[in-house]
Every structure is written in C-alpha cells, then in structure tokens.
Design a protein with these regions (language model features):
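Interface amphipathic segments
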Residues: 1-90, 98-200, 204-220
Length: 220
C-alpha cells in the first residue's frame, strides 16, 4: 500500500508505504512480515509467527529504526503540543496469544515536546527504557525543562494485563526550573517556576494515586 502524501487537518503526516508479505505455512500456522516506510525511509519492521490450536501461540519481533515523532503532531488537538525527534527500539513478543510476554527497549532520540499552554519545551533522556517480562522499567529516567536539573522518573509500569496496566513510580526533582517563559499571546502562564518534588504515583493508569510534596522555591 502506498499513500503519496497524507495530511490530517492541514498537518502533514508524510508519504507512507506499507510492504506486507503473508505466508500461510499450514492450516494452523501463519507468518507475516510488515515494513513501514515514511518519506521513502524505512522506520519500522514487524515479523510475526502465529500458530492456532487449543492454545494459540504468538512469536514476533518489532524493530523501530527511526520513527519520526512529528508524524503524531497533526493528530494532537488544537496544537496543544508539538513533538520532535525520533523513536527507536526493539520489541519481542512471545507466548500465548491471550497473555504474551513482552521484552525489549524503546529510546527517544533527540526528542522533545513543546507544550503550547506553558510555552515551554521538555526534552527526553536518550537512555533506553527497558521492558522485561511485561514490566516497563524507568531507571532514573530524566526529563529536562529550561534548566539543567531534571525531573526524574524511577520505577515500573506493569503491562501484564493491557486492560489494567499498573504503575509503581517515584517522581523527584531538585531545584528544577520548570518554566522560564516571557509573556506571549499563546501561553496561559509566563514567568519563572522553580520546584522541588518528592512524590509517588501508584495504581492502575486510569485511576492513579499521587502522594508527596511539591515545594515552590525562591526565584519563582
């Protein structure tokens, strides 16, 4: 499949091409290879083997080479945010179709998000986010705002049950300059905001419980 140039609400997603090969190995065994291209550059490849039986079995791999995050921007409502950079990673999925095991990693390469409401960009760490035995592991993962002191995420997100993913995270920051924005027409707030944060976030993703301390520092 080939789309010359896909636009959504005036925003360009890109020239997209899907290359798919399906192999029926037997009545109950199937294999599929999928390659995704954006602007004629391969950005992701998926290969999967599926075996039907009393218990269906799945074995697959996904290789994300350089998936441009700007592809998402047209789908963000009201230009609330703008993403830059690329997503990279490798994922392996195996086991029963009803409860597969996921392992691998994802990485944000030179990636940031600009949030229009606060007129600020937040830069993502290039550190790998590991996934082992259906646990997404954040190992002191850093997010930077306008200053040099980061917002730090440490802990796990359990994806064993996709309909009820569970978080167990610690969020910290020390003397973090969260905002440094001059008055402008787009931002809802302006000025400087410096904070200390020491908190936990736990529970299902649709009902998170956050506890901790947030301090506004001098210079705000």
């Amino acid at each position: 499949a080939h789309i010359d140039s896909l636009f959504y609400k005036g925003g360009r997603v890109g020239e997209l091409m899907f290359n798919t090969v399906y192999l029926p190995l037997s009545d109950k065994e199937h294999q599929v290879d999928i390659h995704l291209f954006r602007d004629r550059n391969e950005v992701a490849a998926i290969n999967a083997y599926y075996k039907m039986g009393q218990t269906d079995y799945l074995d697959g791999n996904m290789n994300i080479t350089d998936l441009p995050l700007e592809m998402v921007n047209p789908f963000i409502p009201d230009n609330m945010a703008k993403l830059t950079g690329a997503l990279q990673g490798e994922l392996a999925i195996s086991g029963t179709a009803s409860a597969p095991d996921v392992n691998g990693y994802v990485r944000m390469d030179s990636s940031a998000v600009y949030v229009t409401a606060v007129g600020s960009s937040f830069r993502f760490d290039k550190q790998d986010i590991r996934i082992k035995d259906n646990l997404i592991r954040f190992d002191k993962y850093n997010i930077y705002a306008s200053g040099t002191n980061p917002f730090i995420i440490d802990g796990t997100v359990d994806i064993h049950n996709p309909s009820r993913m569970m978080a167990n995270l610690k969020l910290t920051a020390q003397n973090m300059q969260l905002l440094n924005v001059k008055r402008n027409k787009e931002s809802m707030v302006y000025g400087k905001l410096l904070v200390n944060l020491n908190s936990t976030v736990k529970g299902p993703l649709d009902a998170l419980v956050m506890r901790g301390d947030l301090q506004l520092l001098g210079g705000t």
